[in-house]
């Protein structure tokens, strides 16, 4: 008799792809992951597909108002999705999957505007084209429903972090060091999960490295390690209302962009480039540490994901800043919890697609400030 595969415990169980291109805009991270009710997610494959400089330039240009935006945005979205499709095909090949084995692709898109205070957030994407190129269902536009419910639409990863990284009896913080830094506070016993954006991270570090090294990022923090933190400049950088704002809050390149940095540096033209890089590293560390001290002072363990997890100088700066803020927490990457740091964000959007398929909420209203928990996303059938 032919073998019968057991029915999934939950109708949404199965294999999903997650795609995430963040504020660093260097490329797209992808994962193929199996979700099964009652079990930890199982990653079947991962991939990274870089963006050509022409696409990066187009995406950076769209961060600020300009001429002919609709045409430029549409063309950039098509070019972006072409790279997403390459990532999906690589995941499919590596995992040895047929299209019919993939339940859906959860894709974030590329944020070009984030203005929740004005009632909108804009992630550049063309999910209909991605569905056509992959012949797989696509779930996208995760942030809009939260914004429609009065929330910030960000961060969305905390609900996933709580599912995967929470531990009874231990308060943990998960810190994503992407273009922007954000934290998720996971209470060990009782209390609400909280999370919010802290400030700039790789967005400004990469920008400064590109200007002065001609490279897309400061590899291993070596450029910063050659410099010394300039205390008056650090104070000037921290003199930004966002850092003092209470959560829920979210930010992005709308605020922390090259123009913001140049305006702050105007009074510090004598500071050497390597010292600026060291000071930007300290800015990231201090802005995170202050938020942890204020909202999770009892935290004993902080786990880092995102591109910053590969920067030992930044991690050391974070340890120092936490100590200075009176937080006695160990600092490690999420690899210590079994999830490589470069996979976490893409996994979160695969999980959001899984939640959408089961018509279950993907946000946490206590994190985003929305009127309630909502099912997030929109389906583009293959």
UniProtKB/Swiss-Prot annotation:
Pfam families given for it? AnmK (PF03702)
Q: In which pathway does it act?
A: Amino-sugar metabolism; 1,6-anhydro-N-acetylmuramate degradation; Cell wall biogenesis; peptidoglycan recycling
Q: Determine if Cell division is one of this entry's keywords.
A: no
Gene Ontology annotations of biological process type: 1,6-anhydro-N-acetyl-beta-muramic acid catabolic process; amino sugar metabolic process; peptidoglycan turnover
Does this entry carry the keyword Ribosomal protein?
Answer: no
Q: What is its EC number?
A: 2.7.1.170
**Alphabetical keyword list:** ATP-binding, Carbohydrate metabolism, Kinase, Nucleotide-binding, Transferase
Q: Give the top-level enzyme category.
A: transferase
**Positions of ATP binding:** 22-29
Q: Which reaction does it catalyse?
A: 1,6-anhydro-N-acetyl-beta-muramate + ATP + H2O = N-acetyl-D-muramate 6-phosphate + ADP + H(+)
Recorded GO molecular functions are: ATP binding; kinase activity; phosphotransferase activity, alcohol group as acceptor
Q: What does this protein do?
A: Catalyzes the specific phosphorylation of 1,6-anhydro-N-acetylmuramic acid (anhMurNAc) with the simultaneous cleavage of the 1,6-anhydro ring, generating MurNAc-6-P. Is required for the utilization of anhMurNAc either imported from the medium or derived from its own cell wall murein, and thus plays a role in cell wall recycling.
Similarity-based family: Belongs to the anhydro-N-acetylmuramic acid kinase family.
Q: Which PANTHER family match?
A: ANHYDRO-N-ACETYLMURAMIC ACID KINASE (PTHR30605:SF0)
Q: What is the protein named?
A: Anhydro-N-acetylmuramic acid kinase
Q: Give the source species.
A: Burkholderia ambifaria (strain ATCC BAA-244 / DSM 16087 / CCUG 44356 / LMG 19182 / AMMD)
């Amino acid at each position: 008799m032919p073998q019968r595969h057991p029915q999934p415990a939950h109708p949404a169980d199965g294999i999903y792809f997650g795609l995430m291109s963040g504020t660093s805009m260097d490329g797209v991270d992808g994962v193929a992951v199996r979700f099964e009710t009652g079990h930890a997610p199982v990653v079947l494959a991962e991939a990274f597909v870089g963006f050509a400089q022409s696409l990066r330039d187009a995406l950076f240009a769209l961060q600020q108002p300009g001429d002919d935006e609709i045409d430029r945005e549409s063309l950039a979205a098509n070019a972006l999705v072409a790279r997403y499709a390459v990532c999906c095909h690589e995941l499919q090949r590596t995992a040895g999957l047929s299209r019919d084995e993939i339940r859906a692709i959860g894709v974030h898109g590329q944020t070009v505007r984030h203005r929740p205070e004005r009632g909108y957030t804009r992630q550049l994407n063309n999910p209909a084209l991605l569905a056509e190129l992959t012949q797989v269902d696509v779930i996208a536009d995760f942030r809009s429903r939260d914004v429609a419910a009065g929330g910030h639409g960000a961060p969305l990863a905390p609900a996933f972090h709580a599912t995967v990284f929470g531990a009874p009896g231990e308060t943990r913080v998960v810190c994503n060091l992407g273009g922007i830094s954000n934290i998720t506070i996971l209470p060990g016993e009782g209390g609400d999960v909280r999370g919010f954006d802290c400030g700039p991270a790789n967005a400004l570090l990469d920008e400064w490295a590109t200007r002065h090294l001609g490279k897309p990022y400061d590899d291993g923090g070596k450029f910063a390690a050659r410099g010394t933190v300039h205390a008056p400049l650090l104070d000037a950088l921290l003199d930004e209302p966002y850092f003092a704002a209470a959560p829920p809050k979210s930010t992005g390149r709308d605020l922390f962009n090259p123009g913001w940095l140049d305006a702050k540096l105007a009074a510090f033209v004598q500071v050497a480039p390597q010292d600026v890089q060291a000071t930007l590293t300290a800015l990231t560390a201090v802005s995170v540490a202050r938020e942890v001290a204020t909202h999770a002072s009892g935290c004993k363990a902080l786990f880092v994901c995102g591109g910053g997890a590969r920067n030992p100088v930044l991690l050391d700066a974070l340890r120092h800043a936490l100590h200075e803020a009176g937080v006695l927490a160990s600092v490690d990457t999420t690899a210590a919890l079994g999830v490589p740091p470069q996979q976490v964000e893409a996994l979160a959007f695969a999980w959001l697609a899984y939640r959408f398929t089961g018509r279950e909420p993907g946000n946490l209203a206590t994190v985003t400030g929305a009127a309630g928990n909502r099912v997030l996303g929109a389906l583009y059938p293959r």
